[in-house]
Amino acid sequence: RNYAHLKTFLTEEYRRSDFSLPEINTAFLSKYEFYLRTHGCNHNTATKYMQGLHTIFINAIKDGLIVTDPFSSYDIKLEPVDRGYLTMSELQTIMNRKFSCERLTHVRDIFVFSCFTGLAYIDAKKLKKEEIQERFDGRPWIVTKRGKTGTDVKIPLLDVPLAILEKYKHTAESSKSSKPLLPVLSNQKMNAYLKEIGDLCGIEKNLTFHLARHTFATTITLTNGVPMETVSKMLGHTTLKTTQIYARVINEKTRNDMAALASKLGEIKM
């Protein structure tokens, strides 16, 4: 896709089908970034395309094809993205809802399981019996590797996810240790049914499976005083910087909540 954007840009801006690397300078980069931003790319998407182009220059320098890097004087940075999450009130609304349709109940249960464990979709889908292990505290933990990064993950199971595992322990899929423990549908179907669940529960946020992971990081752990380093390990983040995004979201909410409180108490005088 990056190549397609670049090819169209060259045609529209320069009436050419190609450019040699030595011809590309900071003026070219500035025009290309502006083109991306004015053709449907937000800041971070445009930045990722620019970073892809930068990789070409880095490799060309390593191979001795060019000696200068136009990106050395061109600043490109991703902007932090706020992660959506459910409040405890919203989560409890979903947990307490009774559904007449069994498939919605299954999807809700698996979503809630992820809210209380932080498991990503692929990790919840492949979770097996041998990955539930009793640890030093006498409680069962999830001991696995993140499918996305291969990072070791150890997550203590709270009462809610334990109850969900108990509920589905007699399903056909979980009857053998090599089979998944939970009846997880395709990601596309899960998200489609979650949207339906959100509508039925009056949740105005875009309910997707990944929102559960964000909810674990914010509402379940950080908001309740779990240290960021611990949360980072349970999420399987490779750097603490990734986890800090969630902390920033919580700090921003605290600031807004206190500003609202200050406004309400503004008339009280000493």
Residue ranges, per PLM feature:
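C-terminal catalytic core of tyrosine-transesterase DNA break-rejoin enzymes
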Residues: V112, F116, I122-D123, E196, ...
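C-terminal catalytic core of Y-nucleophile DNA break-rejoin enzymes
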Residues: P80, G147-E166, S175-E196
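C-terminal secondary-structure termini that scaffold catalytic or DNA-interacting sites
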Residues: T171-K176, L261-M270
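Short basic/aromatic active-site micro-motif
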Residues: I24, K48, H106-V107, V184-Q188, ...
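Basic, Lys/Arg- and aromatic-enriched nucleic-acid-binding interface segment
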Residues: H43, T47-Y49, K62, I66-Y121, ...
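Short, polar N-cap/turn motifs at the start of nucleic acid-interacting alpha helices
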Residues: E131-G138, E204-K205, G225-I245, E252, ...
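N-terminal DNA-binding recognition helix of tyrosine site-specific recombinases/integrases
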Residues: H5-E12, F19, T38-S72, I122
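Catalytic-site neighborhood detector that most strongly recognizes the C-terminal catalytic loop/helix
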Residues: Y85, R146-G150, N187, L235-A260
